[in-house]
Every structure is written in C-alpha cells, then in structure tokens.
Amino acid sequence: MRKKLVAGNWKMHGSLAENAALLAALKPALQGIEAAVCVPFPYLAQVQTALAGSSLAWGAQNVSEHGKGAFTGEVSASMLLDFGCKYVIVGHSERRSLYGESDALVAAKYMAAQAAGLTPILCVGESLAERESGVTEQVVARQLDAVVAAAGIASLARAVVAYEPVWAIGTGKTASPEQAQAVHAFIRGKLADLDAAVAAGLIIQYGGSVKAANAAELMAQPDIDGGLIGGASLLADEFVAICRAAAK
C-alpha cells in the first residue's frame, strides 16, 4: 500500500513573522501525519529550527545541477542537506516556463539532488494548449523519459513525481478527479512497462489548485498519492484539511 504525501510549495511568499505563525499552527495539527513544506532558501534555517522533532519534513523549491564551484547565486544539494532538507522540487512548471529550464537541465538537477541524499519531487505536466491539442501524454512522457534516460528507472524508487497540469496552477481551475486520475494512471502504467515494482511504489502527487473543498475527491482516486500544494499551503486551516484528507 502506497503512503500519501502532501507537500506545500510556498513559492516566493513568506516573512519571518508570517512563517513563525504558520509553522506554529501546522506543527501540532499535523502531528503524526506525513507532510512537508518547501520554502524559499532564506527561511530554511528558521524552518529547520521550528520543525525539529516534528513529523513535518521540509525542503527547497530548486537546486543547482552543480555540486559546488563558481556559480554565483546558485545553491547546491549538499547545502540544502546542511539545513535538514528531505525534499527538493525540480522541474516545476514555473521554472520550466519562466526560466527556460529544459528537460535535460531538470534531469541534471534531479540527479544532483539524489547524489546528495535528497528526495527530488519531479514535476511534470502540460499547458492548456497542449491539453487542447490532445498531446498531454506525449508531453508528460517526454518529461519523464529525460529523467529515466539520465538517471535510470530504479532512481524513481528514491523520488516523488508530481503531476501538475500547468493550466490549473494558480488559476482556480482544477483538473477533474477523473482527468487527474487518467494522467496519473498513464504515468504509472508507462513506468510499469520499465519496472513494475518501482511504478507500484511510486508516490505520484497531484498539483494544481488543490484546496480543502476538492482534496477528498482528488485523494480518493486510486493513483493520486497526495498533493503538491501552492497557495493553499500558506493558509494553515486549508493545508491541514488537505493533509488530513490525504491521510484518511
């Protein structure tokens, strides 16, 4: 039986005061529930201190493909490990679209994260134009293939995949539970052709305007194993409700 994992992606939000209040609300409410928050780099030390000894894990939203060196402004996987990170998001649609990250670069970041002992949350998903053109499966397959070709199918036993239809991120539009399940089933089936055991054990999160009101219906789908939560992860009551829906 696969466990479910809900991870909050704070994106470029937060302040020391806001974070302290949010974490203070989340920590007791989520005791014993597997969940995580992926926070901006400057707040990793704060989160490490605040969440020490709790069941909440934490991580980052991006990582360099390089181990160390003259790469001004970059942050390496080993640095994230120093701050107690368990997870790091790679290939988020905002990184792919706004910063031009290619499938090859995402694969390199994924491998750098794993080499340091982090669990990458690999994001895949299609745009509205791609969905309307009927190429959702081809797009998702291409994004997965880049990682499998570079790191091998066995590497996915130490990773999480998040399916995020780009057209549903921050738009208020949500893929219907059936639409989401269809893509999750495609992902698992595609990977099962390469390694059935890895595919069966893989956590595949859904990301895209998940909120308390729709979480239970999404989490009830057989191949949806939690969520990668954006805006709702900044609201304690919403995030707790989503985590509890996944834990049922």
UniProtKB/Swiss-Prot annotation:
What EC class is this? isomerase
Report which gene this protein is encoded by. Answer: tpiA
Identify the EC number(s): 5.3.1.1
Per the UniProt entry, what species is this protein from, by scientific name? Thiobacillus denitrificans (strain ATCC 25259 / T1)
Query: What is the name of the protein in this document?
Result: Triosephosphate isomerase
Coiled-coil region(s) at which residues? none
Q: Does the keyword DNA damage apply?
A: no
Q: What does the record give as the function of this protein?
A: Involved in the gluconeogenesis. Catalyzes stereospecifically the conversion of dihydroxyacetone phosphate (DHAP) to D-glyceraldehyde-3-phosphate (G3P).
Q: Where does substrate bind?
A: 9-11, 170, 209, 230-231
Q: Where in the cell is it found?
A: Cytoplasm
